[in-house]
Amino acid sequence: MRDSVIDIRGLDRVQRARVQAKEEAPKRWSVDDIVALFELPFSDLMHRAQSVHRENFDPNGVQVSTLLSIKTGGCSEDCGYCPQAARYHTDVEKQDLHAAGRGTRSRVLPRRMRQPFCMAAWQPKQRDLEPVLAMIREVKAMGLETCATLGMLKDGQAEQLKEAGLDYYNHNLDTAPEYYGEVITTRTYQDRLDTLDRVREQDINVCCGGIIGMGESRVQRAGLLAQLANMERPPESVPDQLLTQVEGTPMYGMDELDPFEFVRTIAAARITMPQSFVRLSVGRQSMHEGIQALCFLAGANSIFYGEKLLTTGNPEAEADRKLFDKLGIHPL
């Protein structure tokens, strides 16, 4: 009796990836494997990453996403990079959920349909979750893909998000397990993995990446990618942030990462997670457009669009349009 074969031609990209993941034994990446990628000559690494990218995506297409903070500041965690932590003296003004969430519709309406629209708030209490669910339903009704980043989830909350129509949940690992204690002490690495498990159990797409340039070593950058690539199902979207140093946070004043090391990280992410969107996230404002172009060549195919990401700056919309025109890139 012949095994049944699924015709994947009529499926969208995410559905195809799920079918192929079941039919093909995934490669498990060791940290040493990924370090070896980092150590390739730059042109060889770029060629390999671009080849993998072309096998899985339109090489000239970039997903354009929008991020809206619906609750800002006053967070009880101690993430060393984050100006929203209440314990740090930064210029971030606290804004409660209801005030920040007003005007969601006006922020969404100008956007092109099917663009992912991400709503960010840190750990809303259960009583605050209903307004978030209402925002998800509202954005979903406009035909956009919905994404939320709300921090740790408790039992039952992922199910509520799924029922509201959430497409993606963002929850980053930040860094490798070995370096995590240098970044945050109020939550464990396992806490983050448990939240991702809750999201996966509800069959919500996962957006998960990290922050590069927090003082971690190259081996630790490889360790983060190994964590992501070796998940039972790798994240559908992998945001790679370049540390934005904010005065008042413990990581302000750190040595800046060499830009080519960031490009290498993008290339290694593309090779190890060939079917994931690799997103240039926070930190793009400080990148020369030549470095951004190299990141796209290395396999980055998603950006956040708009002048502000949560509490940090982002390239102006017109600058992004001009860069896309120079590079022959079109929005997906």
UniProtKB/Swiss-Prot annotation:
Gene3D superfamilies: Aldolase class I
This protein's pathway: Cofactor biosynthesis; biotin biosynthesis; biotin from 7,8-diaminononanoate: step 2/2
Chain ranges of the Radical SAM core domain: 60-281
Keyword field: 2Fe-2S, 4Fe-4S, Biotin biosynthesis, Iron, Iron-sulfur, Metal-binding, S-adenosyl-L-methionine, Transferase
Residues that, per the record, bind [4Fe-4S] cluster: C75, C79, C82
Enzyme Commission (EC) number: 2.8.1.6
CC cofactor note: Binds 1 [4Fe-4S] cluster. The cluster is coordinated with 3 cysteines and an exchangeable S-adenosyl-L-methionine. Binds 1 [2Fe-2S] cluster. The cluster is coordinated with 3 cysteines and 1 arginine.
Cofactor(s), names only, from the UniProt record: [4Fe-4S] cluster; [2Fe-2S] cluster
Database matches in CDD domains: Radical_SAM
GO biological process: biotin biosynthetic process
Known catalytic reactions: (4R,5S)-dethiobiotin + (sulfur carrier)-SH + 2 reduced [2Fe-2S]-[ferredoxin] + 2 S-adenosyl-L-methionine = (sulfur carrier)-H + biotin + 2 5'-deoxyadenosine + 2 L-methionine + 2 oxidized [2Fe-2S]-[ferredoxin]
Self-association and partners: Homodimer.
Family (UniProt): Belongs to the radical SAM superfamily. Biotin synthase family.
Task of the protein: Catalyzes the conversion of dethiobiotin (DTB) to biotin by the insertion of a sulfur atom into dethiobiotin via a radical-based mechanism.
Protein name: Biotin synthase
Source organism of this protein record: Methylobacillus sp. (strain KT1)
